[in-house]
């Protein structure tokens, strides 16, 4: 089990990795096709359009842009200050700088949460608590989408993250 200090250091290294590689990350993901994820998830949300959407780990805003283009009301949360600035400037929607381990989310606010390749950054010892917090920010019948990178069922990090 990681101590609070170790969790803080892990978060610092993870965010530092994205800060250092922000330009390459943006270039490498801007055209990444996740349309099958969008469609499967959006089709499962029942309320009337527009949906209030939380993009959990929005990065520079690729998915926020897509959701906004469909007429939805997206809000992003992101750990990287660089990505928060890029998303706010280029997308023009609410984007909050937030540590994924210390969330501050309103209750019953969102019709859906889109967590595309982000939950793997949360250490195993914290994931249940974070999932409860995400559940509590969903409206009744809200839907959480999450995807993760392929791996060998090992908790660990690549490079400095």
Predicted features, each with a name:
Residues 128-140:
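A short glycine-rich, Lys/Arg-flanked "PGG" loop and its adjoining helix->strand segment in the class I
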Residues 111-126:
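A short SAM/SAH-binding and catalytic strip from SAM-dependent methyltransferases
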Residues 101-113:
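A short acidic, Gly/Pro-enriched loop at the edge of an enzyme's catalytic core
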